[in-house]
């Protein structure tokens, strides 16, 4: 056992305009080459586009999208006796949100379209409605976990 103290878990800071932690998590994941101001710009433009499209609060759409994409269970590769098994594991809320954000950004990057703000807003609206690539990814993960349920005892 380690003699060092355990690191305290950092709480996510909230962004300056919406005062929301999810927005800040999204900004930190979309960030490339340390250009945080550009990341904020993209997110705020996307949220503005969501406001125009749906005529509802963009934060509620964002929350709904992330809630819809957050997985409850995932599979983890584990080597047992020379063969690798996909072992289903439960996911905590923080890790689930992080995965959901990663999937949403990945799906929006793959989308055809003009700019990232437009693609992200479209993906978030789709995810909030219950369709889109990120939702498909979640369902695929759940299917994998269900198919490999027999290996759950390898945890």
Swiss-Prot record:
Q: Which organism is it from?
A: Amborella trichopoda
- Name the Pfam families on file: Ribosomal_S7
Name of protein: Small ribosomal subunit protein uS7cz/uS7cy
Leader sequence segment: none
Single GO molecular function: mRNA binding
So what does this one do? One of the primary rRNA binding proteins, it binds directly to 16S rRNA where it nucleates assembly of the head domain of the 30S subunit.
Superkingdom as given in the UniProt entry: Eukaryota
Cellular compartments annotated: Plastid, Chloroplast
InterPro entries assigned to the protein according to its UniProt record, in alphabetical order: Ribosomal_uS7, Ribosomal_uS7_bac/org-type, Ribosomal_uS7_CS, Ribosomal_uS7_dom, Ribosomal_uS7_dom_sf
Identify the HAMAP family for this entry.
Ribosomal_uS7_B
State the family named in the UniProt similarity comment for this chain. Answer: Belongs to the universal ribosomal protein uS7 family.
GO cellular component, as recorded: chloroplast; ribosome; small ribosomal subunit
Alphabetic keyword roster: Chloroplast, Plastid, Ribonucleoprotein, Ribosomal protein, RNA-binding, rRNA-binding
User: Which proteins does it associate with, and in what oligomeric form?
Assistant: Part of the 30S ribosomal subunit.
- Give the CDD domains listed for this entry: uS7_Chloroplast (cd14871)
The alphabetized list of GO BP terms reads:
ribosomal small subunit assembly; translation
Disulfide links within the chain = none
């Amino acid at each position: 056992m380690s003699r060092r103290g355990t690191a305290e878990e950092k709480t996510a800071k909230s962004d300056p305009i919406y005062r929301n932690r999810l927005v800040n998590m999204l900004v930190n994941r979309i960030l490339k080459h340390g250009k945080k101001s550009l990341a904020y710009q993209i997110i705020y433009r996307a949220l503005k586009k969501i406001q125009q499209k749906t005529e509802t609060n963009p934060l509620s759409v964002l929350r709904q999208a992330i809630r819809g994409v957050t997985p409850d269970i995932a599979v983890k590769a584990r080597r047992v006796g020379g063969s690798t098994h996909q072992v289903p594991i439960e996911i905590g809320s923080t890790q689930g949100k992080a995965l959901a954000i990663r999937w949403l950004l990945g799906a929006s990057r793959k989308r055809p379209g003009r700019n990232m703000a437009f693609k992200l807003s479209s993906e978030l609206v789709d995810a909030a409605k219950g369709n889109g690539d990120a939702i498909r990814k979640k369902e695929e993960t759940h299917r994998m976990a269900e198919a490999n349920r027999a290996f759950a005892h390898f945890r």
